[in-house]
Curated annotation (Swiss-Prot):
NCBIfam families recorded: PRK09194.1, proS_fam_II
Protein name: Proline--tRNA ligase
Organism: Syntrophotalea carbinolica (strain DSM 2380 / NBRC 103641 / GraBd1)
Top-level class of the enzyme under EC nomenclature: ligase
Record lineage: Bacteria, Pseudomonadati, Thermodesulfobacteriota, Desulfuromonadia, Desulfuromonadales
Catalytic reaction annotation: tRNA(Pro) + L-proline + ATP = L-prolyl-tRNA(Pro) + AMP + diphosphate
InterPro entries: aa-tRNA-synt_IIb, aa-tRNA-synth_II, aa-tRNA-synth_II/BPL/LPL, Anticodon-bd, Anticodon-bd_dom_sf, Pro-tRNA-ligase_IIa, Pro-tRNA-synth_IIa_bac-type, Pro-tRNA-Synthase_IIa_type1
Gene: proS
């Protein structure tokens, strides 16, 4: 491809609404252009990288025995009503009616559609196992779309679905997909971790997220340096540490704490460590229940853990008026003593004695508070967010916190959807059996964005070879010099004949401008053809990663570069 024939509109300045580096660079490098909030045009240069990821995905899905199909993006509401998700999914589901007032949605995932397809086409266990996938545009009406392709409303996704006669078969399918995902992200040239994760709106028994490690990542990852344990912060377990039974030594007493609402303010006023305080959160479930949750003062609530314990979809902090009604005081002074609410507590509270809590009265706290003597807890559970320095729940090592970008997610669904939609097959005894399912997603555009987050420098993108839009950029220093242009044209043709994907920069621009664009767009290898080098029958090779430069004999350059491309792509 010739630059003069190619739509590659680079930008010198970063658009003001771009926040993270991948968004900035994808706009500046002419990969995407914004159409509306969270909705983007994929320009030729960006689409080439996306197609590279899609091809790797297809190869590994096919290798794992999955078959590609394509399902409609528009889904009738009846299927979502059957599964129960029409009411529970939330406002991210874009719903609409057609001219006949029939209800539809734009499918953010396709569990219902694929289950409906299979229940109407698969009759016998002899047709199993089955694994079907698609690569398709999807839509989620995110309340705050941001970060370009990281959190858009419209996005490209690979979603796969496995069907088995029993749980053992489903476990085999899950492991195949897990390993396929590892190969996909390794082939994309990414540094990543597979972590235990919450199943969220998809549901099911267990899941793993594939997280690209990047400082800009929205997600926190907990991992152990001594074993393989790794989990999303929402799922990360907190190990119970052995401790002596707390012994109450102080009397319960009320103390004035004027204007002290926060943990930090109370600790400073009373001259105690935050670890000696217990905070009382008044929360509400989506079912309307109001309850109290106790945490040690230096710990934070993990909403997902609490939702799992309560069996609800969402919890929120109670509004100020509700807090005032149930405690008699403003937020910041709530406490469990004489509180007429259901009380749950994190395990860490179980090991405390003589602690400080709110007194359910303005500007007042209790000191010398103790369990059982002063109040009771209905249930203790792991309710707090894991922190760096916590003990690993698997091996006793020390946990670390990383930042990551989720690019893939695999789920064991069990019979959640097959039971809801009546997807059964006849087993070898002629009995109806509900299908065991798994689902497996990859954000294709997000994978490209995550690769840029992980591979860039102050000058621009540094594409990994396997997903680079082009392998090689041939830069003509001065296309007005016939000898230089002819040599570049010949080199360009040689590379194409060898199967190398090459962009020829034949623009009549200043060399410095071309070199800046070359750094910005991040093509892995650059061959510079100029009069000075041609005097020695040589061209300059520069690797984008690291910037190493060396001269190559003109006659051998194409073959040498081809070998570098083949090695870097692992083929």
């Amino acid at each position: 491809m010739r630059y003069t024939d190619y739509l590659l509109p680079t930008l010198k300045e970063t658009p003001s609404d771009a926040e993270v580096i991948s968004h900035k660079l994808m706009l500046r490098a002419g990969m995407i252009r914004k159409l509306a909030a969270g909705i983007y045009n994929y320009l030729p240069f960006g689409l080439r990288s996306i197609r590279k990821v899609e091809q790797i995905v297809r190869e590994e899905m096919d290798r794992a025995g999955a078959m590609e199909l394509l399902m409609p993006m528009v889904v009738p509401s009846e299927l979502w009503e059957e599964s129960g998700r029409w009411e529970h999914y939330g406002k991210e589901l874009l719903r609409f009616t057609d001219r006949k007032d029939a209800s539809f949605c734009l499918g953010p995932t396709h569990e219902e559609v694929i289950t409906d397809l299979v229940r109407n086409t698969v009759r016998s266990y002899r047709q199993l196992p089955l694994n079907l996938y698609q690569i398709q545009g999807k839509f989620r009406d995110e309340i705050r779309p941001r970060f370009g392709l990281m959190r858009g409303r419209e996005f490209i996704m690979k979603d796969a679905y496995s069907f088995d006669i029993d749980e053992a078969g489903a476990d085999v399918a899950y492991e195949k997909m897990y390993q396929a995902y590892r190969r996909i992200f390794e082939r994309c040239g990414l540094k990543f971790r597979a972590v235990e994760a919450d199943t969220g709106n998809i549901g099911g028994s267990s899941s793993h997220e594939f997280m690209v490690l990047a400082a800009s990542g929205e997600d926190a990852i907990v991992s152990c340096g001594q074993c393989e344990y790794a989990a999303n912060i929402e799922k990360a377990e907190v190990a119970l540490t052995a401790s002596d039974t707390p012994v109450a030594a102080a009397e319960l007493a009320r103390v004035d704490t004027p204007g002290c609402k926060s943990i930090e303010e109370v600790a400073a006023f009373l001259k105690v460590d935050k670890e000696r305080l217990v905070k009382t959160l008044i929360v509400q479930t989506d079912a309307g229940e109001t309850l109290a949750v106790l945490l040690r003062g230096n710990h934070e609530l993990n909403d997902i853990k609490l939702c799992r314990l309560l069996g609800c979809n969402e919890i929120t902090l109670a509004p100020d008026d509700v807090v005032g009604k149930v405690t008699g005081a403003a937020p910041g002074f709530a406490g469990p003593v004489d509180l007429s609410l259901r009380v749950l507590a994190d395990f860490a509270v179980q090991g405390m004695a003589d602690f400080v809590t709110g007194a359910n009265a303005a500007d007042t706290h209790y000191v010398g508070v103790n369990l059982e003597r002063d109040f009771t807890v209905e249930q203790f559970a792991d309710l707090r967010a894991a922190e760096a320095g916590d003990i690993c729940p698997r091996c006793g090592g020390v946990l670390e916190i990383w930042r990551g970008i989720e690019v893939g997610h695999v789920f064991k669904l069990g019979t959640k959807y097959s039971a809801a939609l009546g997807a059964t097959v006849l087993d070898d005894q002629g009995q109806d059996r509900e299908l065991f399912m798994g689902c497996y997603g990859i954000g294709v555009g997000r994978t490209v964005a995550a690769a840029i987050e992980q591979n860039h420098d102050e000058n621009g993108i540094v594409f990994p070879m396997p997903i680079a839009p082009f392998h090689v950029l041939v830069t003509v220093v001065n296309p007005r010099q016939e000898e230089v242009l002819a040599a570049a044209e010949n080199l360009y043709a040689e590379l194409q004949a060898l199967g190398v994907e090459v962009l020829l920069d034949d623009r009549d621009e200043r060399p410095g401008s071309k070199f800046k664009d070359a750094d910005l767009i991040g093509i892995p290898l650059r061959l510079t053809v100029g009069a000075r080098g041609l005097k020695e029958n040589a061209v300059e090779l520069q690797e984008r990663a690291g910037g190493e430069r060396r001269m190559l004999p003109l006659a051998e350059a194409a073959a040498l570069v081809r070998d570098m491309v083949v090695e870097a792509c692992g083929r």
